[in-house]
Amino acid sequence: MHGFHDVFIQILLLLAISVTVIAIAKLLKEPDSVALVLVGLVLGLTQLPFIEEAESYITQSEVFQATVISLFLPILLGDATLKLPFHHLFSQKKTVMGLAFLGTFISSLTIGAASYFLLDLPLAVAFTFAALMSATDPISVLSIFKSLGVKQKMSTIMEGESLFNDGIAVVLFKIASIYLLTYIEMGWAGLGSGVFMFLKFAVGGALVGLILGYVFSQVIRVYDDYPLEVAFSALLFFGSYFIAEHFHTSGVIAVVVGGFVFGDYGAKIGMSEETKTNLNTFWDSVTLLANALIFLMVGLEIRNIDLAGNWGYIVGAIAIVLVGRTIAVYIGTGWIKELSSKERILINWGGLRGSLSIALALSLPMDFDGREQVLLLTFSVVLFSLIVQGLTLKPVIKKLGLA
């Protein structure tokens, strides 16, 4: 290592590669997230001296986890809340809540039980893996929807589900990886403790987001200065996340709630049209760069994963996750008459997993029993999801006649 300067230059090279890949993918009208993962895989499997140090640096567990969770996640969640009008979300509230709450719990239980009995994973490992697989990533899905002219209804459902189930999945992950075995030993008292822990994370995070969202909404009433208001939005996203985490509640839920309050209530009382336009433009650019690096980093992680001799194990995990998603979608939305069978099929196949799952897996302590198993299975499922499901989503949409 020749110092920070050399690593920084090499990371800029990776960013240049990422942006170039996005530009080419857009010309070819293919999902840029899939293209970035594939290029990352190629870079991770080859030795290129001019970016070797940067690859080694950003694929370290601590760096990847900190970059995705602490830096990029608040940005992506906050931007999504600004882009998703609350009245659109409210119009699909039954479907979004059915998927994000009921569906996420069903998915976690199904995948956890199947992994325990069929893959013979230890109980805590099985349900930790299940929690990771319950978080969905709609980034590539939404870009495909937009390019094909899929109804706004479907984009709202997919994005709304992801915003809420990410927060729930993170809470379930913490409970499964840290407290599950203790709660089981406690019996019924453990069940009560688990429910209390979940409510503490979820409600506490929501309160932090609600308070900060309201405070920043009042602050921007005083100003008509869009650079300053953009800065306030950044403070809200990162402040919500880290304050909630400091008080051991859900930072993800805090950002989502705070972002919705700021983007809906704050926009009504304190943003001019110029501010709204510039706010969206700024975060569009930032999220493009963030996603570019995230998906390239996912591909680069191949250098740290040993797939050899584990193919049966991997195929079993992929099958379990696909079945778990199907069960969750059909039970979670089975009571909703407004949703057609074709739309359910699309929601099912479009439930891609992404970088959050890998980042959370990398955050597991080194002494966590089964850490390598969780990393192997999580990485494999995410790769399958982004590449196979991502590349087949467009033909599926056309076949269903939803374009």
UniProtKB/Swiss-Prot annotation:
Stated membrane topology is: Multi-pass membrane protein
Q: Which GO terms describe its molecular function?
A: potassium:proton antiporter activity; sodium:proton antiporter activity
Kindly list the residue ranges recorded as spanning the membrane.
Answer: 7-27, 34-54, 99-119, 125-145, 168-188, 196-216, 228-245, 250-272, 282-302, 311-331, 345-365, 373-393
Q: Which UniProt keywords apply?
A: Antiport, Cell membrane, Ion transport, Membrane, Sodium, Sodium transport, Transmembrane, Transmembrane helix, Transport
List cellular component terms (GO). plasma membrane
Concerning Pfam families, the annotation shows: Na_H_Exchanger (PF00999)
Q: Which InterPro entries match?
A: Cation/H_exchanger_CPA1, Cation/H_exchanger_TM
Q: Which GO terms describe its biological process?
A: regulation of intracellular pH; sodium ion import across plasma membrane
- Cell compartments where the protein resides: Cell membrane
* Coiled-coil regions, chain positions: none
Give the pH-dependence text from the record: Optimum pH is 8.0 for sodium and lithium transport. Exhibits Na(+)/H(+) and Li(+)/H(+) antiporter activity between pH 6.5 and 9.5.
- Which PANTHER family does the record match to this protein? NA(+)_H(+) ANTIPORTER NHAS2 (PTHR10110:SF195), SODIUM/HYDROGEN EXCHANGER (PTHR10110)
Q: What does this chain do?
A: Na(+)/H(+) antiporter that extrudes sodium in exchange for external protons. Can also transport lithium.
Q: Which family does it belong to?
A: Belongs to the monovalent cation:proton antiporter 1 (CPA1) transporter (TC 2.A.36) family.
The molecule here is called Na(+)/H(+) antiporter NhaH
